[in-house]
Structures are given as structure tokens and as C-alpha cells.
């Protein structure tokens, strides 16, 4: 099963205007204009987000949910308004939105407070072979501590999920399925709505890693039907240190707190405490209010540009990139069908280590990622130690894709391959 993403018919992006919003794109690297093709690792930030964070610190900085003074009330109002805004971006109930630092923390929260505490010894959690370590290691820890079993959905030859034995994997004792919406290595976009429907038919909950999808396409928790959704702000034009876990409020009610301290309590006695209402039960201590404000501003920015237009723009860039890489003789990993392909493309140049590829490209001002991309089991499945990865976003241009092709030619010249 794979999500069919129909090419959008929306007007093309005004790239000159968009790029003017990202000051870092004006800089040079090694005497060359910066060609930033690493947005799957982190996105660049528009001035609108920087201004929102700066404005909060300049005018409203205070601790939230505590003071009776005006600054405290303003900070609290902005923090809670940001929760509503971010929840709206993913078409979700704000009561289920917990602010966290990143996708990793969100997935650890689910693994620690749901799987480790509420599942029983012998219960099974199903993952896939394309998962980022952040959607693998927390489940390994939960399995070790709670006596859970882990099972894995394999891959097809073209980089999709092999769902031929899904019925078997979802059968008892499986209680939860946790998987990525979009692979950070292969770019594969999985058909989450169909998979979730099948899981729910078996009374299996679904936890979705949306780190690579929420920034790039319209994601609706109601349409996908998932029970948990984790994503990071820094990959979607928001500040580093911003992110969210959305969960069905009734699940958060059942789950014990992840961290203890101020804000997450209702009443504290010497021997025991009771907990605040959700989602505050999972937000111990002073939150990063500025990051929440910045993430809300990023949601505003992306919605103003238009998620459908962003996705259509990225599809055109990815098609161009795959063609350029093919023409250069590079090996490209992942699906060729744009209907199931996101904005990340992994590749290798024969007889050149990806770190060397990345180093040569960097000398030309081209920023790509090189390594295992926090996906060592997937690298073993692909039978490679590492790959180079180029990834696009709303601010990239076709000229930059051509520049990548010229960079690959330089890699071949330097290494005589």
C-alpha cells in the first residue's frame, strides 16, 4: 500500500519572494552561493519565525501558568494560542497536543508512558525496516524493560513496505504499530490511512513518525486516523527545540506522566501526588515558550504559502533530481514513482565514499547529508555502509538541482571514476 499523492494544480511558488524570507540563503560557502539540500536534517528559518521568537522575548517573556502579572498572562496566552495553532495545522484536537523538544522525545514519551507502562509482558509492537533510530531505540528500551516483543515489516525491492504478511503481523499479541509516514532515507511515503484502518480492525493502535511528512504535505490526524503523531518544528521552518506529540486525549488520560515536577501536578503531598489535566500532565517544568511561539509562526508561514503548492513544487524538484542523478551515473535508492516519493533522495557515486562525495560538494557550496542517516538497519538492508542524501524544500530551485549535477561531475573528476 502506498499513498497516492496527486500532483497539485495550484499556481507555482514565487521563489524570489520565498527565498527573500530566508536570509541564510544569501550567504556563500567556499566562494560559491549556498545550495542548501539538507532540509530533511533541518530546514532553514524565515524571518517571520525569527521575528516571532524575537518579539516574544522583547515584549512578553515570562513563565507560564504561574504569575498573576500581565507578562505572565501574556506569555500563557501566547503559549496556549500556539498549542491551538499547531494542533490546527495537523487537523487535531488541541487537548491532545503536548509540546516536546523534537520527534525523538515525542516517540520516547509514547514508548515510555504507553508501551512500557500499559502493555503487558509478551505483547508485541510492530515496526518497519525503514525506521529512523528514534522510532526504533525507544521501543527496544521499552521491550527490554517490560518484556515486550518486537516484529518488523520488511521492504519491497523498490523501497516500499512489504505488506504481504500484514495480517499476520497485526494478529495477537500485537498491540501497537509504530511507523514512519515518510522515510528520511528512501523518500517513500507510506499509505498510512489504509494501514491504520487495517490495524484498527485488529484493535491495534498506530503511532506515526511524521518528522518528514508534516513539513512537506498536508497531514490530517482525522483523515489518517492515527492514535499518536510525533513531529519536529525545526524541520518545518520552526525553531530548534520545538516539536509536538499529538495523541488521542483518552489515551493521554490513561498514560502515566513521562516526567515529574512543576506544572504537571494537581496536588502534591509528601507520600503521593495527583496529576494535572491533559495535555499539561506531560509538560513538566518551564516549557520553551519561545519555541512554541516560533512553531506557531512557522505553521502560519507554511499555510500562507500553501502546503499543496509546496508539495507540488517539491515533486518537480525530486523528478528533476532523480533525472540528474541518473544522468550522472549515480545509484539512486528508493521508489521512482513520484506518487509515493517525498523530498529526500539518497544516492551513491560508485567507488566513492559518500563522505567524500559530501566533502567535494561542500567545497562547491552544496550542502547534502552523508552517512547512515540514523538508519543503520536500513543501510544493512540496502547492503551499503552509507549514502549521500539530497533533500529539498519550498525554497529550493531547479538551478540548484542542476548545480548538484555539476557537483557530481566534479566528484567523478576528482576521484577519476
Question: What residue spans do the PLM features occupy?
Answer:
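Pyridoxal 5′-phosphate
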Residues: 1-417
Amino acid at each position: 500500500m502506498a499513498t497516492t499523492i496527486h500532483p497539485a494544480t495550484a499556481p507555482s511558488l514565487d521563489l524570489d519572494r520565498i527565498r527573500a524570507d530566508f536570509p541564510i540563503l544569501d550567504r556563500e560557502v567556499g566562494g560559491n552561493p549556498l545550495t542548501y539540500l539538507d532540509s530533511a536534517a533541518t530546514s532553514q528559518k524565515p524571518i517571520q519565525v525569527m521575528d516571532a521568537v524575537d518579539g516574544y522575548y522583547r515584549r512578553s517573556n515570562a513563565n507560564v501558568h504561574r504569575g498573576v502579572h500581565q507578562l505572565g498572562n501574556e506569555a500563557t496566552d501566547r503559549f496556549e494560542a500556539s498549542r491551538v495553532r499547531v494542533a490546527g495545522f495537523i487537523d487535531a484536537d488541541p487537548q491532545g497536543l503536548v509540546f516536546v523538544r523534537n520527534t525523538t522525545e515525542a516517540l520516547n514519551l509514547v514508548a515510555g508512558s504507553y508501551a512500557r507502562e500499559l502493555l503487558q509482558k509478551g505483547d508485541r509492537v510492530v515496526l518497519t525496516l525503514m525506521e529512523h533510530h528514534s522510532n526504533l531505540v525507544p521501543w527496544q528500551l521499552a521491550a527490554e524493560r517490560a518484556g515486550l516483543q518486537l516484529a518488523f515489516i520488511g521492504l519491497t525491492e523498490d523501497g516500499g513496505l512489504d505488506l504481504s504478511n500484514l495480517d499476520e503481523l497485526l494478529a495477537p499479541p500485537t498491540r501497537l504499530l509504530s511507523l514512519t509516514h515518510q522515510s528520511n532515507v528512501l523518500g517513500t511515503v507510506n499509505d498510512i490511512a489504509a494501514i491504520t484502518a487495517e490495524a484498527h480492525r485488529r484493535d491495534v493502535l498506530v503511532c506515526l513518525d511524521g518528522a518528514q511528512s508534516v513539513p512537506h504535505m498536508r497531514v490530517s490526524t482525522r483523515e489518517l486516523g492515527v492514535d499518536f503523531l510525533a513531529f519536529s518544528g525545526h524541520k518545518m521552518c520552526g525553531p530548534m527545540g520545538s516539536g509536538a506529540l499529538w495523541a488521542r486525549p483518552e489515551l493521554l488520560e490513561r498514560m502515566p506522566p513521562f516526567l515529574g515536577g512543576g506544572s504537571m501536578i494537581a496536588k502534591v503531598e509528601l507520600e503521593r501526588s495527583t496529576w494535572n489535566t491533559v495535555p499539561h500532565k506531560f509538560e513538566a517544568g518551564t516549557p520553551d515558550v519561545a519555541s512554541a511561539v516560533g512553531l506557531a509562526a512557522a505553521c502560519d508561514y507554511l499555510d500562507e504559502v500553501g502546503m499543496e503548492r509546496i508539495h507540488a513544487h517539491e515533486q518537480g524538484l525530486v523528478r528533476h533530481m532523480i533525472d540528474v542523478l541518473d544522468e550522472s551515473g549515480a545509484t539512486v535508492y528508493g521508489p521512482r514513482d513520484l506518487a509515493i516519493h517525498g523530498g529526500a533522495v539518497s544516492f551513491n557515486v560508485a567507488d566513492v565514499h559518500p563522505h567524500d562525495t559530501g566533502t567535494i560538494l561542500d567545497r562547491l557550496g552544496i550542502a547534502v547529508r552523508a552517512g547512515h542517516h540514523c538508519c543503520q538497519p536500513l543501510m544493512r538492508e540496502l547492503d551499503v555502509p552509507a549514502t549521500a542524501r539530497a533533500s529539498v524544500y519550498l525554497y529550493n530551485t531547479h538551478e540548484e538541482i542542476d548545480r548538484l549535477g555539476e557537483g557530481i561531475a566534479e566528484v567523478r573528476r576528482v576521484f577519476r571514476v
